[in-house]
Amino acid sequence: MRAVVLASGGLDSTLLARLASDEGYEVFPLFVDYGQLAAQTELSHCIAAMDKNGIREPVVADIKGFGELVPSGLTNSDLHVVDQAFTPGRNSLFLLSAASYAATIEAQTIMIGLLDERFHLFPDQTKDYLEKAEKFLSLAVGQTISVKAPLMAFSKQEVIAMSKAKDIGQTYSCHVGSEIPCGVCIACKEFNIGGE
């Protein structure tokens, strides 16, 4: 049973990959470089996190041009990392990349590390979005694709607690890309609030 897990080197996706592996999935991590400012820092942490958890090294989808086509605070340092964080189509890009990869390795399941939708900030972080995406992705790749987001049952605090219990190791969650997290971006704030 194979699953493509979208992996960023962050807490949520690392825990997701570990849980999938523990459930018996053969995990194929996929790191998407969409031109985000944090790409290199995220990738190095992603490689280390997968290794720490006994999971194969991630395959990299190099789609850097997306960040130039769709600039946001995550892809352009001239834009505000919080106020202009929404990157239209980002999760759709991730899911289409994962579904296409899944089709080439005979996997029917893809996983994304979205959390409890009560706290979603963007329109592509809801169950409704995922249900509609699943239909589109199955049509797009010519096979049934199951989109799973098991962490949607949990808050950030619960994900942090589960990660500690699983001892998943060091992860990286910062949109700026500096080695020391900025403490200002949405990812940092979410982590800090969840850790309180």
What is each of the regions a protein language model found here?
Residues M1-K166:
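ATP-dependent adenylation/nucleotidyltransferase module used to activate substrates
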Residues L79-V82, K166-Y172, N192-E196:
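A polyampholytic, Gly/Pro-enriched intrinsically disordered region
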Residues L96, Q170-I193:
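Local cysteine-cluster metal-coordination motifs and their immediate loop/turn environment
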